[in-house]
Design a protein with these regions (language model features):
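Sensory modules in modular signal-transduction proteins
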Residues: 1-35
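Juxtadomain coupling helices with adjacent low-complexity linkers
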Residues: 2-5, 9-13, 119-176
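Sensory/regulatory domains in signal-transduction proteins
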Residues: 35-131
Length: 176
């Protein structure tokens, strides 16, 4: 809650230390906060001309197998199967843990309102935490599943890289 002006909200969002995006319930990409002069410096590369575009158009250059994963994330959140999907994009350079969090959003009446995405390099946060607490990471022999895990979320591949899921529809909107 608060009484921010539109300009204050814009400054607040632009100051966030991560990339934020929003796609509405009609699968239109409407907002991103980090307008870099060079989109290649972004983890989720976006340019101003994409605002207002359909998600299928924005991701249209992806190979079909990767597009199926984008469709799966959208469908999973749209259908309420999960509240969020978190991924780590494989193949990131050393010193980068490219993390994407896709979160379903809802209108006051409880109906689906779209997806917000938070993208950031988790490595500096992890390094800071380990330094501040004196802890360190140690190897293990199997996957780590924290208590209260979240469904079948795939934390080892990006939305564009996870296994094929075909039951989601990222090309039609709520009004189609």
């Amino acid at each position: 809650h608060g009484i921010l002006t539109v300009n204050q909200i814009d400054m607040f969002l632009k100051a966030m230390p991560f990339e934020l995006t929003y796609a509405d319930d009609n699968n239109q990409f409407l907002y991103y906060n980090n307008a870099h002069q060079d989109p290649n410096t972004m983890f989720a590369k976006r340019v101003p001309s994409q605002s207002g575009g359909r998600m299928s158009t924005i991701h249209g250059s992806l190979p079909p197998a990767r597009m199926k994963n984008v469709e799966w994330v959208i469908g999973t959140l749209r259908n309420g199967n999960q509240e969020y999907v978190r991924t780590i994009v494989p193949g990131s350079p050393a010193g980068v843990i490219n993390t994407h969090n896709y979160q379903a959003m809802y209108y006051p009446d409880g109906s689906y309102a779209g997806i917000n995405e938070i993208v950031f390099n988790f490595q500096p946060w992890l390094d800071w935490y380990l330094k501040e607490t004196g802890q360190r990471l140690v190897g293990g022999s199997g996957p780590f599943a924290p208590a209260g895990g979240h469904g079948d979320a795939d934390a080892t591949s990006g939305a564009s890289d996870a296994g094929g899921h075909s039951d989601a529809d990222a090309t039609s909107g709520a009004s189609n």
